Structures are given as C-alpha cells and as structure tokens.
Amino acid sequence: MRLWPLSNDIKSKQFIKIFKRSDGEYESMIQRVYAGLRKLECGADITIATSKSQVSLIHNQLGCDVSVCVEPCRRDTFPAIVLATAYLHDVKGIAEDEVAVVCPVDPYVESDYFDALEKLGALAAAGGANLVLMGIEPTYPSEKYGYIIPTGREPVSGAEAFKEKPDAETAREYIKNGALWNGGVFAYKLGYVLSKAHELIDFEGYEDLYEKYGELEKISFDYAVVEKESRIQVMRFAGQWKDLGTWNTLTEAMGECFVGPAMLDETCSNVHVVNELDVPIVCMGLKDAVVSASPQGILVSDKERSGYIKPYVEKTDRKVMFAEKSWGDYKVIDVGQDSLTIKVTLKPGQKMNYHSHSRRDEVWTVIHGEGRVVIDGEARLVGVGDVVNMPAGCKHTIEALTELNVIEVQLGKDIDVRDKVKSKGGSDEEA
Amino acid sequence: MRLWPLSNDIKSKQFIKIFKRSDGEYESMIQRVYAGLRKLECGADITIATSKSQVSLIHNQLGCDVSVCVEPCRRDTFPAIVLATAYLHDVKGIAEDEVAVVCPVDPYVESDYFDALEKLGALAAAGGANLVLMGIEPTYPSEKYGYIIPTGREPVSGAEAFKEKPDAETAREYIKNGALWNGGVFAYKLGYVLSKAHELIDFEGYEDLYEKYGELEKISFDYAVVEKESRIQVMRFAGQWKDLGTWNTLTEAMGECFVGPAMLDETCSNVHVVNELDVPIVCMGLKDAVVSASPQGILVSDKERSGYIKPYVEKTDRKVMFAEKSWGDYKVIDVGQDSLTIKVTLKPGQKMNYHSHSRRDEVWTVIHGEGRVVIDGEARLVGVGDVVNMPAGCKHTIEALTELNVIEVQLGKDIDVRDKVKSKGGSDEEA
C-alpha cells in the first residue's frame, strides 16, 4: 500500500516492474532475485513459498513452470518455513542432509548478494552449525530491523544475542559494537528444521501439515528456532541490501528518472516518474518529487512525505483496477454505474479457467490476435472484431492462439471479482 | 495548448469547466459569460461568432438553441465582425440603428463587467460616437496587450492614440499617463460597421459575404476601423478582467483547490488540482504546483514554470482523446495497435449524425440507458447489454431515449476521426 498506485490489494511491491535490465526491458524485484539465483554456478533448485493470492502473479512474472509452495492461509514465518521445508522433502524428494537457503524477495540486492547466499549454503553444508545466518552490515541505525549481536568481528562468528527493533540511540550503540541486521536470510539442512518442526507441531508430512495449516500457532521462525539455537553461525555481508518499502527508497534504486511515457523539463531535479498508464506525464519545475500513475490512481508527492501515504490510500476506492494473472493481465478502463469495462491481455498459448458468473453478463470484443473460445461447451475460433455474448450463468473460457487482446464489458449490479464459479470441462486440460 | 491536458486541438480554454457555480456544478468561461449576459435587464439578444470546429462544443455547453454565426474559415477580426454584423442584420433582421456590443469570451470577469457592457451599449445608442470602446484599467505593465491612450481621465473620454504591445518600460510610462488596455470590447450601431464593410469589401449581404469569406483579406478590426475612426469614445472599466491563458492565472481564479477526485495532504500549499479522470489524485508535500489529468495526459508543474509547457505538449501524441459534441461527449479509454475503444455519452433526446466509415469497423455495447439505432436504414430499440455490429461502409446512428452510455470499439488500420461519411436518412429529421 505504501507504493500506491503501483501496488494494490493484490499486487505488492515485489512485483512492480521498475528495474531496467540490460536488454531495455523492465523487471520486478522478484524477477531480479529469481534471475540472480538462476545464474548461480551451484545450480540451486528454486522454490517460492508464497500465499495463494500471489500465485497467479508469480506465474505471470516467472513463468508457469516455476516451483511454488503455497501457504493455504497466512500464518507467521515458522509455519511457512516448516511447510516449505516439508514441501522440499516430501514433494520434491530432497534429502534431509541437503541444504536449504531461505531469502525474502523484499530487499533490493546486487550480484554479490547471490554469491553470499551460495557461501551461506556451503557453510550450512559443512555442518559447523545447525543454522547459518546472514548478518547484514547496517548502513544506518534503523529502528525497523532486528539486530544480531555476533560473538566477534570475524567474517563468520557465533551469535551472542538477538535484539528486536531497538530505538535509534540503542541501535547506534549496537552498531558501534559490531551488531548486524537480521535480514531473515539463513541456511540449514532440511533434517534440522523438520526435527524442530516435529518437536513443536504434531504432523505426519507435507500433506498433513497443509491440511492443518490454518490451525497452526502464529509464531516467527526467529522466536521459535533462531533465538533458542546455540549451534549457530553468523556470516557478515557488507554488500547492497536495501528495503525498498517506500517511494523514497524505491526511487533511489531506479536507474533512470522515469519508467513509462513521461517528459521532465530541465528545471526538474531529483524527480522520478513511474507511469503505467498509456497517456504521457509532463513534469515541470519540480524538486525532490515522485509522480506515479496506474489504473488505480495518481500520486504526486514530495519524496520525504511519500512515506505517509497510507491514510490517504485507505480513503480511496480500493477496488482492484489492474491485475496480473497466470494467463496474462487485465486493467479496468471504465467504471460505469452498473458496468465495468476491462482490457484483457492473454499470452500466446494461455487460457483462463473455464468459469461463469452468477450476477453479471459479459461481452467480449476481440481487438487483437486470434483465439479459441468455449461457450457452454461449444468451441469456436475468434479473431479481430468477433463479439462473444455471455449472459449470467453461461460457462466460458478463452484461449490465446497468438497474443490476444479483448475488451470485456461486464454488466450487472454490484459487480464483484468474487462472483466467479469455476466449472469443469471447457478445454482439453484444466487451466 | 497552454492549458494542456484540459485543452486539446479541439477544446480551447473557454470550454474548460473549472468555475464552481452556486449550485455546486462546474462551468466553463463561455458558460459564465453566457449566463452573465442572459441575466442583463436589457434582455440582450446573444449571438456567438465562432469557427466551425467549435460549434458542437458550443451546442454541448450552451444548448442547441443558442444563436451561432459560423465563420467558414479563420480570417482576422475585421472579417469576423463584419460577418457577424451582417448575420445580425440580414439573418436575424436587426435594424441598422440597433447597437451591437462585441466581447471576447477569453477573459475571466465578474458581474460588474456585464453592467459595463450594458453601459457601453447605451453610449453607442446615444450616438455621441461611432464606436465606443471599453478601456480596461491596467493592473500591471503587460507586454501582451494593446493600449488605448485616452484624451483624459474622465469615465468616458476620447481616444488620442492606440499602441500595440509595448515593452514593459514603455507600458509603465503609458500607465502613468492614464493609458488603458484595449480588451477588444466595443459597441457600435450595425449600420456603422456595415457601411465601413461596404467601403472595404465588395459584397451584397450575409450570404454573399459567407461565400466569399475565404478570399477576404486578413486584417484586424483595430487596424481596419478603430485606429482610423475619429468619432470614438472610451469608457474606463476598473473591475475584474483577467486573461486566464496559463495554468498559473487559471488556478488563481479557481474557488477551491481541486476539481474532480483528489486529496491534498496538510503539507501542500498553494496547490491546485483539476482531474478529469475517474481515478483519484493524491498530492503530498507539494508547494506552488498545479496537477491536472485528462484522457490527453497528466501535467505536474510548478505554477511559474507552467507557462513554458508548449514545446512539451508538441512532443506528445496530439490525437484527440476526448471531445464534447452537440449530442454529448466521448473519451478514448484504450488505444490498441489497430483499435481504439471509446466511451460515448449521449444526452437524452440527442442523436449522432447518420454516418459510415470507409476504413474501420465498429462495435457498440450499450452499458447504460435506452436508445434507438438505425443500421443501414433499419431501426431498432437497444438497451443495456445489446451489441451492434457495424462493418466498414455500414450506415449508422444512435439516438438516446434516456441518457445513454455506449462502449464503442473501433477496428481497423490507421483509425482517424476524419474517416467519416455523412449519409442522408437514418432519422425523421436530419441531425
């Protein structure tokens, strides 16, 4: 929400495409991290632990063959890491003495970070400790992070204590004495976490744990495991590691001053523009400002002030105005009294689930590409200019034979994304 | 163009709805002036002289029964005033000894201005001069205006000389000596301008003049008439009279700090927002700034800098993204590779011209209201959810029985507003 209007209730900051790749395309934080991990020489096997609501987005941005461990609901980090570890062992068949390295995709990092992850894994494999933590060299006395107090200043040391979110004064003291940020990056052998899990949770294996997931206690991995473990190592990391949680920090990491159609006059200074609309943004005479536009809204803010956006976003209409799905994406282009018009883009070869709506009619007009629709069991090919009528209750799906753009008009009272009934059939295989 | 993105190639500043009426609705400059004139006790008969491209907009904003004298092409002010005067005399049958008062709709004025217009007309009727000019008390030594040097400082005097756009130094000198701005506001008896016209132009009456209009010399009324006339009076006017030609001056005249969906945090100061999009604009920590959004684009500018917008607007895509027509309005909601999707709003009882396109297909989906379409001569009623297909060449029109909203998908290569063929028929009477 703090990166509104680019983030909304279903798209969080990890998915905002804001970083320019060498080929000129833009990528998101999760795409950067995934690409960085895939380049590692050790050929790490990557699994993404995430909540249900993010799976479509992950498939959209990383491809449909990425390995995903889905949390059926939100618990805390201990249940999440146990579930992912059980998934690696029971579903992917990875042995108990193999090493897992856990890293969040939130922080902005560079290539040295991935090398450090590899070292972290090697330390865990060597078996000198049950848990190997990455300790990040602090760049300022943050009040938001947890601190690790290491036993010494050598590259790899033990951990003496863990301190949660101190005030700035205390943080400054910690840092003077060599304390490190706890970034939630650590490595362990699967067997270690599985045995800890069985001590604390009564479960058989992955399937059983998944079933019980909603009943598990909300408890952090730090609290349940890290702070109680004596066989622990801390590896110092001094490279780039930056939380891009606010517009102010996010724009610092942007390579150029704008993404999307924008013009800044020569009297603008320290201005960043991220424009996901098709219309141009013209900026003149601005200082220290961020300007961002999406189908969700438009933000114009002094960079320092941008951290205080939350109460204003809460006052806006929170209806989701754009989303990335596994099959492509959509954006709302008109909100009427009893209608909603959206532009749908399907990637070649992708298709929607076969579904129906109980309280709204829909009309598709194909504006680009070729596809195949199934309407109440009847398949037919569609191309530019073809119109498909789907009254409420009518089961429908569309599959893109080439990249496909469709204008979808939704008609009805109280149109709601949750009015969706999945159906069986409609295609050769289930989407 | 200087008020981009609210103005575009077909909508000029006079039509931007930015002034809050007492009933809470917003009105444009032309609506303000028209309402002011209609309130005059003298019951002035109002005719609007304008170019062809503005007629739809005038009908949209002032109603379809407003009297309009259309210039078939752009000449200068002398031909325009002669044409309008001939229109009043020959078409509307107004006698030669009746008075016409000419006033531009550009400046921002208040009610005392309309009273002054009435006095100007009374002076012309009294016959003490052939021409009665309004001389506006300057508020600063502008380099953009023409100056009238009056023969004295009394409320009504003679004119000694006219000076075009002096430098600021000279303007300051003029003002010290009692000079006034020439705002192009003046009154005369129709017979006077008609006789001047016949001296300079060989024409029979209005119809003949209209036919010849394109061949007339481009010459200003000031140069052709005012500066050569010795029987002239100048009436001083000291009320509000402000050119709102830039964002900086326009926002000064706004009653509130925003129009349209917007939120400004408490750290904003001297910030104005005009938002014609449906999505909210959130402003935080801005100073002396103007923010404006329309389907044409988004402007974020320091107020002083906003006067330098022209070269940036010239670099944007100039395709017209919204327009007001006599029957309602439309806005572009999606631009595809070979498609354009627009939202059309028709006012109750209004209809489009019966027309066809030679190089594009169209699909209408009715999203609100009820109407009647005529497709290649066949009439039928349409309501919410009805879809109408119009391949290239198909003649079509739609009439609104209630307020009507339609999503129109245009499909074809090089879609252009000029691809429009008007047809006969299609309705009981021609639109």
Question: What positions do the PLM features span?
Answer:
Chain A
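Conserved core of the sugar-phosphate nucleotidyltransferase
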Residues: 110-216, 233
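Left-handed beta-helix
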Residues: 188-388, 394-397, 415, 420-430
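C-terminal structural segments of small proteins and small subunits
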Residues: 407-415
